[in-house]
Amino acid sequence: LVQSDNANLLVDVGLGCRATLSALKMYNLSLSDITAIVVTHEHSDHIGGISSFVSHSPVPVYAPKAIANLVAKRATCCDVSGIADATEIADLRIDRYECSHDATACYGYRFSDGTNSVATVTDTGCVTTGLVDFLAPCDRIQLESNHDVDMLKSGPYPYPLKRRILSDFGHLSNAQATQVLSDLVGSNVKSVILAHLSEHNNTAEL
């Protein structure tokens, strides 16, 4: 959830309508308070709840241009708009960061209202050029910290899945996220939310 004076944006909707509504109630919001949905990529855990959401509360849906039609088909939305750099929704400017993930197109986003700036970057298998510069102007960031490498290697996942997660097109490890945060020391970032933590290969304590 990204909020400004004039907008309430959801970044991805992977949960069903009931679970999404329950989460929104924590912020005293309902489905009808959402201004738009912004999609990072086409994997089902990120778009699986969009169809149910828009059937209850029709809102604009935005996705990377390369996958706008694909998202519309998979999420059974009537229309999905392509999002480019410097796209504006209400009072928010949206800039993109291209992630390294095994999707047709996958982006992190930075949202700015002219005074404050927040960003979310998940589902990227490696730290590509420009990530630190993309995050540095933000007041708050949400960054992937998916797995502990040793837990993943010794865990129950089948080898092909382990290889996918550990690849440059998988997910950021705790160590990779730590390096990004170390590089952000001295930047404008004041608050960090670690996201996309694996239930099987990570712990909050780590």
How would you name each of these model-derived features?
Residues 63-116:
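Metallo-beta-lactamase
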Residues 43-47, 69-70, 104, 127-129, ...:
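Active-site environment of divalent metal-dependent phosphoester hydrolases
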Residues 11-14, 34-42, 62-65, 119-123, ...:
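Active-site neighborhood of phospho(di)ester-bond hydrolases with catalytic His/Asp-centered motifs
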Residues 17-63:
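Active-site metal-binding motif and surrounding structural segment of the metallo-beta-lactamase
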Residues 129-206:
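Cap/insert and terminal regions of metallo-dependent hydrolase folds
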Residues 1-27, 107-123, 140:
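Conserved beta-strand hairpin/beta-sheet module of binuclear metal-dependent hydrolase folds
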Residues 48-57, 72-74, 202-206:
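Metal-dependent catalytic neighborhoods of phosphoester/phosphodiester hydrolases
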Residues 7, 57-60, 186-190:
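A short helix->loop->beta-strand "cap" motif at the edges of active sites that frequently abuts
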